[in-house]
C-alpha cells in the first residue's frame, strides 16, 4: 500500500535478460500498475503479457468484491498495454481512459480502439473518483507521442508513466540513481526538451509521491529526483570528473589511457572513469558520458574507419543529443591514423562541445612524443577542472544578499542559522542582489 487508498498491483520479471531487446537487466524489471480505491475505482496501466494471470489476480485481491470502473492508460508500449483487452474482457462495465494517440495505437495493437468504452482525454481534463480528483497531463515524446501523466490532488501523487523509472525488479534493493540514470539516458535521454516541458508543467503541483511504470514509488525527498531529471534533461553536468572511453586491439591504446588516468589522478581530478567499450555495458558507458563533464575518446584506425565498438558508442551519444561537454581525443594507427578526425566528425552535430587543444597521436605504440601529449592532455583537462573550482569559489565570494526588512547587505553564502545583525530576521527574509 502506497497511501490509504492507493495500492500497488504490479509484477516483477526475473526472466528477462534484455529490456527492449538491448539493455542488460541483471536484476530484472518491474512492470508497475496501481489502483485507487474510492467511490469509483481506477486501475493505472496493465503489465507485460507474460504476467496476465498474476496481474488480474492482484487486481482481485486488491478490490475484494468490488470491480474497477476505469483503466487509465498512460503509455502504450506493450510492457504496459499488453493486457488492456484482457482487462476489458474480465470487466465489461469498465471504461478505458487514454489520449487520442493511445487509442490510435490500440487499433494497431488490438484491431480495435474500444470506441464503445473509451474516454479520450486532453491536457488538463479531470476525473472525479469521489474524494480523489485526477488531473490528466499530456507528456508527448516522454518518450512516445501518446504519453500522459496523472496527478491525484488528494494524495498529491504524480503517476509519471516511464519518467522517473529505473531498471531492476522491486524485490532487489539497490541505489536508485545509478539504474535510473542508465534507464533515463538509454531510453528517454534523446527527448530532453520534451522532459523539460513536462517539468515546467508539473512545477506548480504539490507532489509528495511519484509512481512510475518501472522501479519504486518515490515517496521521500521528491524534489531531489525532480532536480536530477532537470539536470539530465537540460544536459547539465551532474558530477565533475573525466570519463575515458576506449577500445584497444593489442594493448597499446590501453596503455595510453591507463597513463592518462594515472596522470589525471596525480593532478587531483575528482573522478576518473576508465571504460573498455569492448567489454563494458554500452548503456552504462553512455550514462557516465552524460553524468560527468569531460569525455576522452581513444581508439584505433580500423578498416579505414574507427573500431566498431567506438563507432557504436559515439552513435549512441549523438542519437541522445550529447552536448555541453569537453571532449579529448586519442588516436592510434600504424601507417595512416585517422581516428581522431572521424570521431570529431561524428560529433559535429552535437551542440556546445569543446574539444581540447591537445590530441594524442600514437603511431603503433607510445613514445616520448605521444607520452608528452598524454601529459599535456591531462594538464589541459585538470586545468579546466581547477578553473571551474576557482570560478565557483569566486562566485560564492561575490554573492550578495539584502535583508528585505532593514536593507542590510551580506556578502557570501547565507548559513542556514544566519540572523541579520541589524534586525535579527533569518535567511528566508534575504534576497539575492542582482
What spans do the regions from the language model cover?
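Active-site neighborhood of phospho(di)ester-bond hydrolases with catalytic His/Asp-centered motifs
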Residues: 44-46, 68-76, 96-99, 158-162, ...
Amino acid at each position: 500500500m502506497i497511501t490509504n487508498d492507493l495500492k500497488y498491483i504490479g509484477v516483477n520479471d526475473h526472466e528477462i535478460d534484455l529490456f527492449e531487446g538491448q539493455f542488460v537487466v541483471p536484476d530484472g524489471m518491474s512492470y508497475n500498475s496501481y489502483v485507487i480505491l474510492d467511490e469509483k475505482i481506477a486501475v493505472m496501466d496493465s503489465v507485460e503479457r507474460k504476467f496476465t494471470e498474476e496481474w488480474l489476480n492482484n487486481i482481485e485481491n486488491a478490490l475484494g468484491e468490488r470491480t474497477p470502473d476505469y483503466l487509465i492508460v498512460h503509455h502504450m508500449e506493450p510492457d504496459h498495454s499488453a493486457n488492456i483487452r484482457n482487462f476489458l474482457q474480465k470487466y465489461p462495465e469498465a471504461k478505458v481512459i487514454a489520449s487520442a494517440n493511445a487509442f490510435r495505437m490500440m487499433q494497431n495493437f488490438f484491431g480495435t480502439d474500444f470506441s464503445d468504452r473509451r474516454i479520450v482525454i486532453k491536457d488538463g481534463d479531470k476525473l472525479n473518483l469521489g474524494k480523489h480528483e485526477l488531473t490528466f497531463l499530456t507528456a508527448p515524446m516522454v518518450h512516445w507521442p501518446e504519453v500522459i501523466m496523472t496527478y491525484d490532488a488528494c494524495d498529491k501523487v504524480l503517476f509519471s508513466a516511464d519518467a522517473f523509472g529505473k531498471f531492476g525488479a522491486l524485490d532487489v534493493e539497490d541505489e536508485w540513481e545509478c539504474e535510473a540514470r542508465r534507464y533515463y539516458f538509454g531510453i528517454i535521454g534523446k527527448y530532453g526538451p520534451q522532459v523539460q516541458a513536462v517539468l515546467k508543467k508539473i512545477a506548480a503541483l504539490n507532489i509528495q509521491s511519484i509512481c512510475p511504470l518501472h522501479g519504486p514509488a518515490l515517496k521521500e525527498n521528491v524534489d531531489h529526483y525532480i532536480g536530477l531529471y532537470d539536470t539530465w534533461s537540460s544536459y547539465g553536468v551532474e558530477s565533475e570528473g573525466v570519463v575515458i572511453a576506449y577500445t584497444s586491439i593489442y594493448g597499446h591504446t590501453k596503455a595510453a589511457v591507463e597513463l592518462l588516468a594515472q596522470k589525471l589522478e596525480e593532478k587531483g581530478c575528482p573522478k576518473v572513469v576508465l571504460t573498455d567499450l569492448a567489454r563494458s555495458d554500452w548503456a552504462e558507458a553512455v550514462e557516465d558520458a552524460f553524468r560527468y563533464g569531460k569525455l576522452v575518446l581513444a581508439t584505433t584506425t580500423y578498416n579505414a574507419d574507427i573500431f566498431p565498438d567506438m563507432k557504436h558508442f559515439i552513435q549512441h551519444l549523438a542519437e541522445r543529443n550529447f552536448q555541453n561537454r569537453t571532449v579529448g581525443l586519442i588516436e592510434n594507427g600504424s601507417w595512416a591514423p585517422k581516428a581522431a578526425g572521424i570521431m570529431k566528425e561524428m560529433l559535429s552535430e552535437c551542440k556546445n562541445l569543446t574539444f581540447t587543444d591537445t590530441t594524442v597521436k600514437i603511431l603503433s605504440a607510445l613514445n616520448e612524443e605521444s607520452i608528452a601529449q598524454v601529459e599535456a592532455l591531462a594538464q589541459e583537462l585538470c586545468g579546466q577542472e581547477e578553473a571551474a573550482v576557482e570560478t565557483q569559489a569566486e562566485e560564492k565570494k561575490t554573492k550578495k544578499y539584502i535583508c528585505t526588512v532593514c536593507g542590510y547587505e551580506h556578502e557570501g553564502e547565507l548559513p542556514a542559522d544566519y540572523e541579520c545583525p541589524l534586525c535579527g530576521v533569518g535567511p528566508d527574509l534575504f534576497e539575492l542582489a542582482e
